[in-house]
Amino acid sequence: MKVTKSDIVISAVKPEQYPSGGLPEIALAGRSNVGKSSFINSLINRKNLARTSSKPGKTQTLNFYIINDMLHFVDVPGYGFAKVSKTEREAWGRMIETYITMREELKAVVQIVDLRHKPSVDDVNMYEFLKYYGVPVIVIATKADKIPKGKWEKHAKVVKQTLDIAPSDELVLFSSETKKGKDEAWNAILAKINK
């Protein structure tokens, strides 16, 4: 999909701050520093609409971006960052749970994992949490450019097995450097919002 317009709408914490208008939403979740902002920027052809950070755990709000006036990307705070206090982690959990369970506009969650590594316990917990609530998931395995092409299948198998990816959910290998998987990611997203 060609993105001609993309802007941040609001950084929200509470449901009353979520945008109105009924546009379909795709939430993006992933461990801190997994490359979520790079994934968003790569999909929308912008250098830094979603701010990339060398400081993990920087996003502490739900950041709503409007894309081509037809859908919202919702950047969810990164999970699994050890230096965040227990209180902050609990607040994060409540905010995510409220959004995922109450938001009718939510069509799917893009869960971002690092193709180079076996998904972490936090990744597995997040995937299971989404499945528990019946949320469709698109798993994006980033940093494919850091692995020789001949090993992609082996790494993809580890991701599939560790997360126990449901047959209805997709796995897309992606690289924000080479743009590998960009079209597949968009196709998967558009299929979910057009259901």
From Swiss-Prot:
GO cellular component assignments: cytosol
Highest taxon of the lineage: Bacteria
SUPFAM superfamilies reported for this sequence: P-loop containing nucleoside triphosphate hydrolases
Gene Ontology biological-process entries: division septum assembly
Cofactor entry: Mg(2+)
Keyword flag Cell division: yes
PANTHER family xref list: ENGB-TYPE G DOMAIN-CONTAINING PROTEIN, MSS1/TRME-RELATED GTP-BINDING PROTEIN
Name this protein carries in UniProt: Probable GTP-binding protein EngB
Keyword Cell cycle applies: yes
Recorded family membership: Belongs to the TRAFAC class TrmE-Era-EngA-EngB-Septin-like GTPase superfamily. EngB GTPase family.
PROSITE patterns assigned to the protein according to its UniProt record, in alphabetical order: G_ENGB
Binding-site list for GTP: 30-37, 57-61, 75-78, 142-145, 174-176
Cited Pfam families: MMR_HSR1
Function: Necessary for normal cell division and for the maintenance of normal septation.
Gene Ontology molecular function, alphabetical: GTP binding; metal ion binding
Binding site for Mg(2+): 37, 59
Keywords noted in UniProt: Cell cycle, Cell division, GTP-binding, Magnesium, Metal-binding, Nucleotide-binding, Septation
Domain EngB-type G: residue ranges: 22-195
